[in-house]
A protein has these predicted regions:
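Short, highly charged, low-complexity non-transmembrane loops/tails of multi-pass membrane proteins
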Residues: 257-276
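Generic multipass alpha-helical transmembrane bundles of integral membrane proteins
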Residues: 110-246
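Cytoplasmic-side transmembrane-helix entry/capping segments in multi-pass membrane proteins
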Residues: 63-70, 80-84, 99-111, 138-139, ...
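Short, Lys/Arg-rich, polar N-terminal cytosolic tail immediately upstream
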Residues: 1-12
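Alpha-helical membrane-inserting segments
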Residues: 27-35, 52, 123, 147, ...
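Generic transmembrane alpha-helix motif of multi-pass integral membrane proteins
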Residues: 45-56, 64-71, 88-95, 105-110, ...
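Interfacial aromatic-anchored transmembrane helix boundaries in multi-pass membrane proteins
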Residues: 69-98, 111-112, 149-156
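Hydrophobic transmembrane alpha-helices
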Residues: 13-67, 71-75, 79-82
Length: 276
């Protein structure tokens, strides 16, 4: 019997209220410190304000955090700022019902240097339904690629050169969107891994609270999906992330759900073989 984790409800409520302030502060702090517009010493103050607004009101903090990058991006290219503004409004609408989970994609650039982007489907669980989980994961992985491109690093998961993001001075939104899309999808392997992880995030709900069988099924699914997406990807980090996810899913607290009929029949067959 695998032990289940018990969570103190009071601490859970406090954490649920305060935790979203961290990604808001990280998004605003990194944007204002990296992209030229605000004075250098303003970054910490604006990041703190984003965190404070998020604690006071999740939607207020989300709106502020998503709005701050518009000015630095407009300083680089007007078209880019317009494209981002449209995307930010769509993102705000998508997560209107779950504002505390709207900025989970910020975890992408944090997991990438650790070789742990394979854990993103697990991170995205808090986003809600399959569509939101897939969106968070896809944007998180793409954001990790953008950060790598700005920093002159290599693409996460697949390796290789990061995208060239030389889009300064573009005034037309359509041109800016096309240029950015071409840069992000220039590596087919990276795009396939992004889709694979997004698909795993969409499917993770089916494995939750089903005990070790659910965890094992998801671990196997994630392993196969990510390794088949790019045969040249580094296997050990992806496999480790898959089975760490499997272990955490296996001990997830909550009311257990019955296994699907396929798995129940598989267990019966395995027991018969073992006893024969």
């Amino acid at each position: 019997m695998i032990p289940r984790i018990r969570i103190n409800r009071a601490w859970h409520r406090r954490g649920k209220r305060v935790a979203p302030a961290l990604p808001a502060a990280l998004l605003v702090g990194w944007t204002t410190a990296t992209l030229p517009f605000f004075p250098a010493h303003w970054s910490a103050g604006i990041a703190f304000l984003a965190a404070l607004l998020t604690v006071v009101g999740p939607r207020l903090g989300l709106a502020f955090a998503l709005a701050v990058p518009v000015l630095p991006l407009g300083n680089i290219a007007l078209g880019l700022a317009i494209v981002y503004g449209i995307a930010a409004c769509a993102w705000f609408a998508l997560f209107w019902a779950r504002p505390r989970a709207a900025l989970l994609f910020v975890a992408g650039p944090l997991l990438a240097p650790l070789g742990a982007l394979g854990l993103f489907p697990l991170v995205a669980v808090a986003a809600g339904g399959p569509g939101r989980r897939a969106a968070q994961t896809a944007v998180g992985v793409l954001t990790a690629g953008i950060v790598a491109g700005i920093g002159g690093g290599t693409l996460p998961v697949t390796g290789g050169a990061a995208p060239n993001l030389a889009i300064g001075g573009i005034a037309a939104p359509a041109t800016a969107a096309s240029t950015l899309w071409d840069a992000l999808t220039g590596s087919q392997a990276f795009l396939l891994e992004t889709l694979a992880l997004a698909g795993a995030a969409a499917a993770i709900g089916a494995a939750r609270r089903r005990g070790p069988w659910g965890g094992a099924a998801f671990g196997a699914f994630l392993t196969v999906l990510t390794l088949f997406a790019d045969a040249g990807a580094s296997a050990p980090p992806l496999v480790l992330a898959a089975w760490l996810s499997a272990a955490l899913i296996a001990v997830e607290p909550g009311i257990p759900r019955p296994l699907p009929e396929f798995f129940r029949r598989s267990r019966v067959r395995l027991r018969l073989v073992h006893g024969s």
